[in-house]
Design a protein with these regions (language model features):
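Conserved, structured core segments of small domains
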Residues: 1-106
Length: 106
């Protein structure tokens, strides 16, 4: 089962402790061969929202929130439980939230 894993960070919390352990998480997912892709994303100040077939385009932050999507990973796991276990070990889970969404596959 493939899952899109959103890494949501809270800018009000310090994240320096997580920097060292991300490499450990990446090594573990490589060892288990479950991570297919992943990248950090730029912050909400660089975001663009497009609606109504391109007629409405908005740049910049959109919501008065301190939590935003800071990155994503694509996981390919045997079960949902395995995906949850792997996501729960991501170091940024301590500084925000990890959201898992299964791919729509038949």
């Amino acid at each position: 089962m493939r899952f899109l894993m959103f890494v949501c960070v809270d800018e009000t919390l310090g994240m320096t402790e997580a920097d060292d352990t991300v490499e450990q998480w990446l090594a573990e997912t490589a060892r288990r061969d479950v991570r297919r892709e992943g990248h950090q994303l730029r912050g909400p100040d660089d975001a663009t929202t497009v609606r109504d077939h391109g007629a409405l385009i908005t740049d910049g932050p959109f919501a008065d929130t301190k939590e935003w999507i800071g990155g994503y990973d694509i996981l390919d796991c045997a079960t949902r439980e395995e995906a949850i276990e792997i996501a729960s070990k991501h170091p940024l889970a301590r500084f925000g939230a990890i959201e898992l969404r299964p791919f729509w596959e038949e």
